[in-house]
């Protein structure tokens, strides 16, 4: 029993998955070039992972509210 998932949802999920992997690692190594302290580099990498997660949640909520607005407009017609 397969569920049809919209392609936009899959694309968005893949984008944020890649960002969750790449951005913290990239942040760690870029900051490591400026300071030898791994605590700072690791902390900023963890912060970047949290930023990606928060942005994903905000995008998901906006998408959900847009769907409700579209459904509301269809019912009024």
Curated annotation (Swiss-Prot):
Superkingdom to which the source organism belongs: Eukaryota
Cytoplasmic side: 1-13, 60-77
One GO CC annotation: ER to Golgi transport vesicle membrane
Prevents secretion from ER, short sequence motif: residues: 74-77
Compartments, as annotated in UniProt: Endoplasmic reticulum membrane; Endoplasmic reticulum-Golgi intermediate compartment membrane; Cytoplasmic vesicle, COPII-coated vesicle membrane
UniProt entry tagged with the keyword Membrane: yes
UniProt keyword list: Cytoplasmic vesicle, Endoplasmic reticulum, Membrane, Transmembrane, Transmembrane helix
Chain ranges passing through the membrane: 14-34, 39-59
Topology relative to the membrane: Multi-pass membrane protein
InterPro entries, per the entry: Vma21
Protein's UniProt keywords contain Nucleotide-binding: no
Listed result of changing residue 74 to Q: Secretion from ER
GO biological process: vacuolar proton-transporting V-type ATPase complex assembly
Subcellular location, principal: endoplasmic reticulum
Residue ranges annotated as Lumenal topological domain: 35-38
More info: Present with 1480 molecules/cell in log phase SD medium.
Job of this protein: Functions with VOA1 in assembly of the integral membrane sector (also called V0 sector) of the V-ATPase in the endoplasmic reticulum. Escorts the assembled V0 sector in COPII vesicles. Also required for normal packaging of the SNARE BOS1 and possibly the ER to Golgi transport receptor ERV29.
Database matches in PANTHER family: VACUOLAR ATPASE ASSEMBLY INTEGRAL MEMBRANE PROTEIN VMA21 (PTHR31792:SF3)
Family per record: Belongs to the VMA21 family.
Stated name of the protein: Vacuolar ATPase assembly integral membrane protein VMA21
